[in-house]
């Protein structure tokens, strides 16, 4: 059994075209044939699959409640938890710079890799099989999730915290965009002033402006120890 056989067992899916899995595991720092296009595809499929599952699971919830629960289930920290369960860091291909910086442990890289694997599965065997695999991954998370304030996304929770303390709201600014139009990486600076323990700028990256802003807000919430 090779190392990718072991990974396939962990994710509960066997590829017909193993090259797709290899590409899904390849970070842009390692090769020109990397996983960002697959990540783009997987992100959309994951959002649809979780949205459909929540729609049927919570027939009395409104659109806002469903959106918040979906955001909780597909956000970067949740995907990073799945990645660690699969031990994706042991299988990823990273450039030397990312390896030195511990990229195989970074939440954003792990989360992107999960989405890329979803995209690869959809190209390999289609949507029906892929959505079932995703449901298998999320079985426990879907069973545990409930509507409520704790499902609000990071930006909303940060804004409400600052408003409650009568502090200035954070400002978000895109400071860099890398890559071609179909696979861009956004770098966002989030500035927070006089928020108790912090008064500084946080920097985060994501495959969209929204993801980068949410990642920056998550950093601040962790700094403030807000669950």
UniProtKB/Swiss-Prot annotation:
Q: Which InterPro entries match?
A: dsRBD_dom (IPR014720), RNase_III (IPR011907), RNase_III_dom (IPR000999), RNase_III_sf (IPR036389)
Q: Which residues form the active site?
A: 43, 115
Disulfide linkages recorded for this protein, renumbered to the chain, are: none
SMART domains per the UniProt record, alphabetical: DSRM (SM00358), RIBOc (SM00535)
Q: Which residues form the RNase III domain?
A: 4-126
Keywords associated with the record: Cytoplasm, Endonuclease, Hydrolase, Magnesium, Metal-binding, mRNA processing, Nuclease, RNA-binding, rRNA processing, rRNA-binding, tRNA processing
Q: What is its EC number?
A: 3.1.26.3
Catalytically driven reaction(s): Endonucleolytic cleavage to 5'-phosphomonoester
Q: Which cofactor does it need?
A: Mg(2+)
CDD domains, alphabetized: DSRM_RNAse_III_family (cd10845), RIBOc (cd00593)
A GO biological process held by the record: tRNA processing
Which NCBIfam families did the record assign?
A: RNaseIII
What family does the Swiss-Prot or TrEMBL record give for this protein? Belongs to the ribonuclease III family.
Q: How does it assemble?
A: Homodimer.
The name on file for this protein is Ribonuclease 3
Q: Where does this protein come from, organism-wise?
A: Haemophilus influenzae (strain PittGG)
Name the gene that codes for it. rnc
């Amino acid at each position: 059994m090779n190392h990718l056989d072991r990974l396939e067992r962990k994710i509960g899916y066997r590829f017909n075209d193993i090259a797709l899995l290899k590409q899904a595991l390849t970070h842009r720092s390692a090769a020109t044939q990397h996983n960002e296009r697959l990540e783009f595809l997987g992100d959309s499929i994951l959002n649809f699959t979780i949205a459909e599952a929540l729609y049927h699971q919570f027939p009395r919830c409104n659109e806002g409640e469903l959106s918040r629960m979906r955001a909780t289930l597909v956000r970067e920290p949740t995907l990073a938890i799945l990645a660690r369960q699969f031990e994706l860091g042991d299988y990823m291909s990273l450039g030397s710079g990312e390896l030195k910086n511990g990229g195989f442990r970074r939440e954003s890289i792990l989360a992107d890799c999960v989405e890329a694997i979803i995209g690869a599965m959809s190209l390999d065997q289609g949507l029906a099989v892929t959505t079932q695999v995703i449901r298998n991954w999320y079985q426990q998370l879907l069973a545990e999730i409930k509507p409520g304030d704790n499902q609000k996304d990071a930006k909303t929770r940060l804004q409400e915290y600052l408003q409650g303390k009568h502090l200035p709201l954070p400002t978000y600014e895109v400071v860099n965009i890398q890559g071609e139009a179909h696979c861009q990486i956004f770098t966002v600076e989030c500035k927070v002033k006089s928020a108790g323990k912090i008064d500084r700028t946080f920097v985060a990256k994501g495959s969209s402006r929204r993801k980068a802003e949410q990642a920056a807000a998550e950093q601040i919430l962790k700094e403030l120890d807000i669950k």
